[in-house]
Amino acid sequence: MEGGWPARQSALLCLTVSLLLQGRGDAFTINCSGFDQHGVDPAVFQAVFDRKAFRPFTNYSIPTRVNISFTLSAILGVDAQLQLLTSFLWMDLVWDNPFINWNPKECVGINKLTVLAENLWLPDIFIVESMDVDQTPSGLTAYISSEGRIKYDKPMRVTSICNLDIFYFPFDQQNCTFTFSSFLYTVDSMLLGMDKEVWEITDTSRKVIQTQGEWELLGINKATPKMSMGNNLYDQIMFYVAIRRRPSLYIINLLVPSSFLVAIDALSFYLPAESENRAPFKITLLLGYNVFLLMMNDLLPASGTPLISVYFALCLSLMVVSLLETVFITYLLHVATTQPPPMPRWLHSLLLHCTSPGRCCPTAPQKGNKGLGLTLTHLPGPKEPGELAGKKLGPRETEPDGGSGWTKTQLMELWVQFSHAMDTLLFRLYLLFMASSILTVIVLWNT
């Protein structure tokens, strides 16, 4: 009795090796006596069921060919922070079992049966990128044809790793891969093929996909690489799945409000520079824009730096620069109306040059100084820009930086005119920078 258990182990091992290494396998005869109009006696396939632990072959040197296809029925979510794609698909496997064969004419016309998949040998096909445990439900069935062809459909919820690039968010396209491979069988034992053409897989997936949410399917391509691990070579089929984000939600909730606020900020330059409402108005816009960014933060990706974040930072910077320009002009007007300093000669000459008719420099707006009740036509001293340009100034009038011929009122008028010219110049520079920046972002989004 002491040597009984090792002897049984040796016998079992010899039986297994003989089944695997034999040059020809035994062919099982399907007895049609078990077929009738009410079904099939399971005992008819019992010999096949008993060998479900072994790959079915009649010649060990010939690998089993497994044809693969799948249908992508839902894109459940994309996690940019974890770089994961969650999808639902049906995986279809087709292979031949040489031990299953019957004549439908002799078997009451039955040419196809459904059998519990757990009673058959199943290829160990898995998705390489999958980051989750296989949760295939139990009790699935497989179709068996009279020629021994087996078709096995398997529903799968796949959480797969995907290299996500969110730089072009929300106009981004992602390319994820599903790589089907065998975990155990090398190319000597199993080869993978296509059950359907790629265009058929794409068309079927587009028709049956049930999610009309954030992502849409663009197309599917394939490649057939080989994976080498040590001395073993495994066959693979790699599918490239291209998906695109639907940007409507983000355009309506992010881009349109942001563009409106920036446009209103630009239009606020048309408020009179002497008005006390321009600076508070711009401050209110700036605070409102910050509140808008805080409220919409949940719609932005949690990782990376998408181009839309650069766009928001650019808009915020433009509003800050606009406010600083208003502060600068307000300061110039304050100095001009309280204690105007002597104007340097070069600045006075530049002002005369720029305000002369036909010049390309920005002309100072002919706005009244509402705070003083003065206008350029009512202030004594210097003439209008046109008159100043056409008149040869006397020796005393050509020295605004120290000559005694210039009164405080005349200096005030010059500094107010200079402030208006600077306001116009800075406004044009602001518009130029804003237009070029926004066009650059749009071009980057379209590349």
Curated annotation (Swiss-Prot):
Membrane-spanning segments: 249-269, 283-303, 307-329, 425-445
Main location: membrane
A GO MF term: excitatory extracellular ligand-gated monoatomic ion channel activity
Catalytic activity, reaction form: Na(+)(in) = Na(+)(out); K(+)(in) = K(+)(out); Ca(2+)(in) = Ca(2+)(out)
Membrane topology according to the record: Multi-pass membrane protein
Gene3D superfamilies: Neurotransmitter-gated ion-channel ligand-binding domain, Neurotransmitter-gated ion-channel transmembrane domain
Cited CDD domains: LGIC_ECD_5-HT3C_E, LGIC_TM_5-HT3
Xref: PROSITE patterns: NEUROTR_ION_CHANNEL
UniProt KW Transferase keyword: no
UniProt key word Protein transport: no
Pfam short name (any one): Neur_chan_LBD
One of the record's GO cellular component terms: neuron projection
InterPro entries: LGIC_TM_5-HT3 (IPR049944), Neur_chan_lig-bd (IPR006202), Neur_chan_lig-bd_sf (IPR036734), Neur_channel (IPR006201), Neuro-gated_channel_TM_sf (IPR036719), Neuro_actylchol_rec (IPR038050), Neurotrans-gated_channel_TM (IPR006029), Neurotransmitter_ion_chnl_CS (IPR018000)
Keyword field: Cell membrane, Disulfide bond, Ion channel, Ion transport, Ligand-gated ion channel, Membrane, Postsynaptic cell membrane, Receptor, Signal, Synapse, Transmembrane, Transmembrane helix, Transport
Quaternary structure and partners: Forms homopentameric as well as heteropentameric serotonin-activated cation-selective channel complexes with HTR3A. The homomeric complex is not functional. Heteropentameric complexes display properties which resemble that of neuronal serotonin-activated channels in vivo.
Protein name per its UniProtKB record: 5-hydroxytryptamine receptor 3C
Lineage of source species: Eukaryota, Metazoa, Chordata, Craniata, Vertebrata
